[in-house]
Amino acid sequence: MKIEFNSEFTQEGQEKNINFVSPVEISEYEGATVYEFSEPSKEHLSRIEINSNSNEVLIITDSMTMILKLNEEVENAIALGQGKFFLKSLLNKLEHNDSESFFAYVLKDTSGNELACFKITLKIFE
């Protein structure tokens, strides 16, 4: 199986896009659909867990773990080098089926200032 990953995001007033196709491993874990894949240019493993029942998304990369909950702000600790900083996440939209998933979220600093908006689409194909 393959995944087409597309991330449209706005950060500091600039719109950016990341798009790639990669082999994907799909599994189930505690009611969530799990996608494990590598971004070709960085060769690091990413894991995205989507749980439609609890309306949660978990994003795990080599440098961070981000928890997203639908219509609920969540404080996330992000590790950088020896230190940590905190961001708030808010999942605004979640759509999920076997062949395509879409979710949109906002990242804020701890004072509530918006830092970035993301729209993520995952398409699964043979």
UniProtKB/Swiss-Prot annotation:
Source species, domain of life: Bacteria
Protein name: Uncharacterized protein MYPU_6810
Species for this entry: Mycoplasmopsis pulmonis (strain UAB CTIP) (Mycoplasma pulmonis)
Lineage: Bacteria, Bacillati, Mycoplasmatota, Mycoplasmoidales, Metamycoplasmataceae
